[in-house]
């Protein structure tokens, strides 16, 4: 959403409003930056009416509401944190594993990979199919429905006695629900949040993922001493509480004003905007915001209903944005974060930490705590800078981690872990934790932010679903094949992710524009104007430009690519 940062008194209240719609507003002459627009009296310029920017303390209510929506991330994180422990618990292995000749039980790599990773396939399918509920019934009702589907999957898992394929089916169904959540939660937040804290509020989704992972680890640690199905049924049973909390929260969350405008529910859209921005329903800036949304929706209506074919259109640059979203979400998985969580147990064992549950808790704490940093930096420094910094820092960490593992950890080879170097192990632990910090403060939350901000309303649900599905598919491939790969090449696997991280850095620099401080409609305008991504941070929307603004300079660059990077 937009904000009023100009024509205000010292305390952020409007001084004068001279127009009621964005189409009637004149433009400022000072375009020093997107978020610092001033009235220039010498040139008699007046800013467009925008929703006022208030102190962050004024947005406590909307932050809590968005946190309720973001709780969908907790549901996903809880599954990630608990399933990693289930496959190591004795009762789970006895019920769903295979029996050896001596009567003991085990889970093969194939069965483990299927049980853990099939959830991601369910998420990919659910993200594509169930996200349509958001367009049909609204984002809030859509979220309630997919949470109920998730609960059905949990019931099937809890009811499983000793048939692994029953548990397998339950995970597919719960994955369908989580896939729908992963699309609708960031979508609702991005369409409801005030624009100057939108990145922060969308990042709540990742914060809830890490919180769910951490609490899942702690719950596994608490139930590991039991010898019966309490080990895994109690953590699954708690999912009912999470579902009830989220459905109840949706009763208090305002519906997306963009969805409401699309359904011609204008008064409700105005109330939603007023509630999210903590302003009066009668505030002219609310009407101006609705006018801006109406203009965008009307333009999309004139173009006709969106089809799958339109996703591949290059005229509106939807296809370019779809590819960008798919690659951003794929790269998030290819950072290697799951590799660290999988292989972390081996590293920690090398320095005497034999309890894999303790290992998980340590990594979970770093992951969760670091996400608070991301909530601050995403709107402070912008999306591009955070993604570029994250890719560069993770590359450095991965080089050290893999190199020490290959050359120093096991001096007598991987077949003799008993001779592991404690110093090398300590070094790798430090860089593993620093790597997780870098991931949690950059690619973990900001991938969702970029995808949620990049698409026009008419194709948003479809594009977000496809982009998010690419994340789930790579999650499945990573989860299924990592045990086989690490057992074959050990720490050399880190160099594969290092190559992906280098590719990520260059891709972001050349193809991902900055969207910090822009409304979703202004993001659409920037794409249509063909602004070069590395110049996008200097771009100003047409409603805020002066007569001397040169948009052509942002569409071309005479400098070689390596100078542009510098």
Curated annotation (Swiss-Prot):
General function of this protein: Probable glucose transporter.
Question: What is the protein's major site of localization?
Answer: membrane
Q: Where is the composition biased (Polar residues)?
A: 16-32
Q: Which InterPro entries match?
A: MFS_dom, MFS_sugar_transport-like, MFS_Sugar_Transporters, MFS_trans_sf, Sugar/inositol_transpt, Sugar_transporter_CS
Q: Which UniProt keywords apply?
A: Glycoprotein, Membrane, Repeat, Sugar transport, Transmembrane, Transmembrane helix, Transport
Q: According to the UniProt record, where is the region Disordered? A: 1-39
Q: Where in the cell is it found?
A: Membrane
Give the encoding gene's name: KHT2
Q: Name one Pfam family in it.
A: Sugar_tr
CDD domains recorded: MFS_HXT (cd17356)
Protein name, per record = Hexose transporter 2
At which residues is glycosylation annotated?
A: 88
Mapped to this chain, the residue ranges on the Extracellular side of the membrane are 83-112, 162-166, 220-233, 354-357, 407-428, 487-492
Family membership noted in the UniProt record? Belongs to the major facilitator superfamily. Sugar transporter (TC 2.A.1.1) family.
Q: Does Nucleotide-binding show up as a keyword for this record? A: no
Instruction: Please give, as recorded in its UniProt entry, the membrane topology of this protein.
Output: Multi-pass membrane protein
Q: What residue intervals traverse the membrane? A: 62-82, 113-133, 141-161, 167-187, 199-219, 234-254, 334-353, 358-378, 386-406, 429-449, 466-486, 493-513
């Amino acid at each position: 959403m937009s904000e009023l940062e100009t024509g205000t008194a010292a305390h952020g209240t409007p001084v004068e409003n001279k127009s009621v719609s964005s189409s009637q507003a004149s433009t400022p002459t000072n375009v020093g930056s997107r978020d610092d627009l001033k009235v220039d009296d010498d040139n008699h310029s007046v800013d467009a009416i925008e929703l006022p920017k208030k102190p962050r303390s004024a947005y406590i209510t909307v932050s809590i509401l968005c946190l309720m929506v973001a709780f969908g991330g907790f549901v996903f994180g809880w599954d990630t944190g608990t399933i990693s422990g289930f496959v190591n618990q004795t009762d789970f292995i006895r019920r769903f594993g295979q029996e050896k000749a001596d009567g003991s039980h085990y889970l093969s790599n194939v069965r483990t990979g299927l049980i853990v990773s099939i959830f991601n396939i369910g998420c990919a399918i659910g993200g594509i199919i169930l996200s349509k509920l958001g367009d049909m019934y609204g984002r809030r009702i859509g979220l309630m429905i997919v949470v109920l589907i998730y609960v059905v999957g949990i019931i099937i898992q809890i009811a499983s006695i000793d048939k692994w394929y029953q548990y397998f089916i339950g995970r597919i169904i719960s994955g369908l629900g989580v896939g729908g959540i992963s699309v609708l939660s960031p979508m609702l937040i991005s369409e409801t949040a005030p624009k100057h804290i939108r990145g922060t509020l969308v990042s709540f989704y990742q914060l809830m993922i890490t919180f769910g992972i951490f609490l899942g680890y702690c719950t596994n640690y608490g139930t590991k001493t039991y010898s019966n199905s309490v080990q895994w049924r109690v953590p699954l049973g708690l999912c009912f509480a999470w579902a009830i909390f989220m459905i109840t929260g949706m009763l208090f969350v305002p519906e997306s004003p963009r969805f409401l405008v699309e359904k011609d529910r204008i008064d409700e859209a105005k109330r939603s905007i007023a509630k999210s921005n903590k302003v009066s329903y009668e505030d002219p800036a609310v009407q101006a915001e609705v006018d801006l949304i109406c203009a965008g929706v009307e333009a999309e209506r004139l173009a006709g209903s969106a089809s799958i074919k339109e996703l591949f259109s290059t005229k509106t640059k939807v296809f370019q944005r779809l590819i960008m979203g798919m690659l951003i979400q794929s790269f998030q998985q290819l950072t290697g974060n799951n590799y660290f969580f999988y292989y972390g147990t081996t590293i920690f064992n090398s320095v005497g930490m034999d309890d894999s549950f303790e290992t998980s808790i340590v990594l979970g704490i770093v992951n969760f705590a670091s996400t608070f940093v991301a909530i601050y930096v995403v709107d402070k420094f912008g999306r591009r800078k955070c993604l570029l910094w994250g890719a560069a820092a993770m590359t450095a960490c991965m080089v050290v981690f893999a190199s020490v593992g290959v050359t120093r950890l096991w001096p007598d080879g991987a077949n003799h872990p008993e001779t592991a170097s404690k110093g090398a192990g300590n070094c790798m632990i430090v860089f593993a934790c620093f790597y997780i910090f870098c991931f949690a403060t950059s690619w973990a939350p900001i991938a969702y932010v970029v995808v949620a901000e990049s698409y026009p309303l008419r194709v948003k649900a479809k594009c977000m679903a496809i982009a998010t599905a690419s994340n789930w598919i790579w999650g499945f491939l990573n989860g299924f094949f990592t045990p086989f790969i690490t057992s074959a090449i050990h720490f050399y696997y880190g160099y594969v992710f290092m190559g992906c991280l280098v590719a990520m850095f260059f891709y972001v620099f050349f193809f991902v524009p900055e969207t910090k401080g822009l409304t979703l409609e202004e993001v659409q305008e920037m794409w249509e104007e063909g602004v070069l991504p590395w110049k996008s941070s200097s771009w100003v929307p047409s409603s805020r430009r002066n007569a001397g603004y040169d948009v052509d300079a942002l569409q071309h660059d005479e400098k070689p690519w390596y100078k542009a990077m510098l």
